[in-house]
């Protein structure tokens, strides 16, 4: 829901996305009561393998380029499920709209690729490129965000996803 011009967005910030993806997310938030969870997810997709993790794992190239000026704070889908469970236990019948930001510490896409490369032992040469300063990080100072850093999350996710894939 955010353009990425500012970064470290909190739940009170006015959504300012201008692309179709962001605008559809904004329209989905037009509710009076319920829970809205904002997160950038990192995980595998059995049906469509086009996320950053699948791209790295399935890519045949020995090189991968990551943006050094694109910042976000993703969370693995496994950690997201744990956070959602906590939120649902706390909010059994929300009478008002509640917005939660869930994510890890902010990281560049370049550094995320380096961590994925290490955790999955891909042996790829990670190079840097520029996107034109984008910071879509969310302020996640809440009880529901994971205590594990993204590398720890990916290690746990890898063990878990080996059961499925």
What spans do the regions from the language model cover?
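Residue-level signal for the nucleotide or nucleotide-sugar donor/cofactor binding architecture
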Residues: 72-75, 107, 138, 148
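Active-site YXXXK catalytic motif of short-chain dehydrogenase/reductase
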Residues: 21-25
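Active-site "gating" loop of Rossmann-like NAD(P)-dependent oxidoreductase/epimerase domains
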Residues: 1-19
């Amino acid at each position: 829901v955010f353009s990425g011009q500012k970064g470290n967005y909190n739940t009170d910030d006015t959504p300012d996305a201008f692309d179709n993806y962001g605008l559809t997310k904004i329209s989905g938030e037009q509710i009076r009561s319920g829970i809205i969870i904002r997160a950038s997810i990192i995980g595998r997709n059995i049906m469509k393998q086009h996320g950053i993790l699948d791209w790295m794992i399935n890519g045949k190239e020995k090189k991968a380029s990551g943006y050094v000026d694109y910042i976000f704070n993703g969370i693995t889908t496994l950690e997201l499920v744990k956070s959602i469970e906590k939120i649902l236990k706390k909010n059994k019948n929300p009478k008002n709209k509640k917005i939660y930001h869930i994510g890890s510490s902010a990281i560049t896409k370049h550094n995320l690729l380096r961590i994925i490369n290490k955790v999955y032992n891909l042996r790829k040469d990670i190079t840097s490129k520029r996107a034109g300063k984008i910071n879509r990080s969310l302020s996640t100072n809440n009880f529901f965000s994971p205590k594990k850093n993204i590398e720890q999350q990916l290690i746990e996710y890898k063990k878990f996803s080996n059961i499925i894939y």
